[in-house]
A protein has these predicted regions:
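A short, Lys/Arg-rich alpha-helix, primarily the initiator
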Residues: 2-22
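Short basic helix-loop element that most often maps to the first helix and adjoining turn
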Residues: 15-30, 34, 59
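Short amphipathic helical patch at the helix-1/turn junction of helix-turn-helix
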Residues: 11, 22-23, 41, 51
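Recognition helix of helix-turn-helix/homeodomain-like DNA-binding domains
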Residues: 36-50
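Short, basic-rich loop-to-helix N-cap that marks the start of a DNA-contacting helix
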Residues: 49-59, 68
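Short C-terminal boundary/hinge segments that cap the last helix of small helical domains
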Residues: 65-72
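Conserved hydrophobic/aromatic packing and binding residues within compact polymer-binding modules
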Residues: 17, 31-32, 42-45, 71
Length: 72
């Protein structure tokens, strides 16, 4: 089971991804296509429902034109 600080981090990262996606006026579908990950995974990451790999974060950040460090 995840600790509170881990859950907070997962939710914070997801929220930053969502905000950047909206800033770029992208749909979850477009982000999933650009990052080559399933659309439902984008939604779950944004809602803080799942933790994800560094590789997936890298793909998302590349699609959102940000650095991974911008998520923390």
């Amino acid at each position: 089971m995840l600790e509170n600080d881990e859950l907070t981090l997962i939710k914070s990262v997801g929220e930053k991804i969502r905000l950047r996606r909206l800033e770029l006026n992208l749909s979850q579908e477009t982000l999933s296509y650009d990052a080559n990950i399933p659309r439902n995974q984008v939604g779950r990451i944004e809602r803080g429902e799942i933790s994800t790999s560094i590789t997936t974060l890298h793909k998302i950040c590349k699609a959102l034109e940000i650095e991974i460090r911008d998520l923390f």
